[in-house]
């Protein structure tokens, strides 16, 4: 009996405790989500700040904030990767990973996980869907008699990235219209824009859309 208990305790303490902090989440994130670096390379990156990734390039640690549970990595010359942890009301953890590539317009995605990498926040009531129309003033478009179909046809491609925050719990959604449209077209549509950033406000368990505003890069 004592031997069985000892083996059980050994196994428990041998497993990585993902909920302890953001570093563990980053190191053990399955490679299907982050193939540039394996767990050993990620551990080395947190210690040495720069490593050679699986594609022969350099990946660089840009930020490591254990207190605020945030990590940011430049995976390549044009690629970026972030992870962030929130603590829910029931004391469980919620994690997010965000990535984007700029060439030159920036485009990326975001995924959420519970502990042990179970996908989370798939309900639109927890994380709202983002539309290009969120960034435009519909009344101004209607005043110029720009139809919904004309608008959708012009913006059938939508470049956005999700920036996690090193010192806060909100998320910034940033569109990159300026970099994928030619200058003449951008100047035509700019008067109808409300902004190039949409703040997603953290409400202790879900996000809701907040203000849209401009900020130059």
Label every model-predicted segment:
Residues 79-82, 95-96, 105-110, 155-159, ...:
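Short, surface-exposed coil-to-beta transition loops
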Residues 1-25:
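Bacterial Sec-dependent N-terminal signal peptides
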Residues 123-203, 208, 214-217:
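Short aromatic loop motif centered on NTY/YTY
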Residues 93-101, 169-176:
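Short beta-strand elements that form the blades of beta-propeller/WD-repeat-like
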Residues 94-129:
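Mid-length scaffold segments of soluble, non-membrane domains
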Residues 60-74, 114-125, 202-206:
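Surface-exposed loop/turn elements that mediate protein-protein interactions on large endomembrane-trafficking
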Residues 20-88:
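Terminal domain-start segments
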């Amino acid at each position: 009996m004592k031997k069985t208990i000892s083996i059980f305790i050994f196994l428990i303490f041998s497993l990585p405790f993902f909920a302890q902090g953001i570093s563990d989440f980053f190191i053990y994130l399955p490679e299907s989500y982050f193939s540039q670096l394996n767990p050993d390379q990620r551990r080395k990156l947190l210690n040495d700040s720069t490593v050679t990734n699986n594609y022969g390039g350099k990946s660089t640690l840009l930020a490591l904030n254990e207190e605020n549970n945030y990590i940011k990595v430049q995976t390549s010359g044009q690629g970026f990767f972030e992870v962030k942890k929130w603590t829910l009301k029931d004391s469980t953890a919620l994690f997010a990973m965000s990535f984007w590539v700029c060439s030159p317009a920036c485009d990326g995605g975001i995924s959420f996980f519970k502990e042990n990498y179970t996908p989370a926040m798939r309900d639109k009531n927890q994380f709202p869907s983002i539309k290009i129309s969120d960034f435009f003033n519909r009344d101004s478009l209607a005043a110029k008699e720009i139809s919904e179909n004309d608008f959708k046809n012009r913006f059938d491609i939508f470049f956005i990235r999700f920036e996690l925050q090193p010192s806060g719990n909100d998320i910034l959604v940033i569109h990159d219209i300026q970099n994928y449209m030619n200058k003449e077209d951008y100047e035509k549509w700019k008067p109808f824009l409300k902004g190039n950033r949409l703040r997603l406000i953290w409400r202790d368990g879900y996000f809701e859309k907040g203000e849209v505003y401009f900020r130059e890069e």
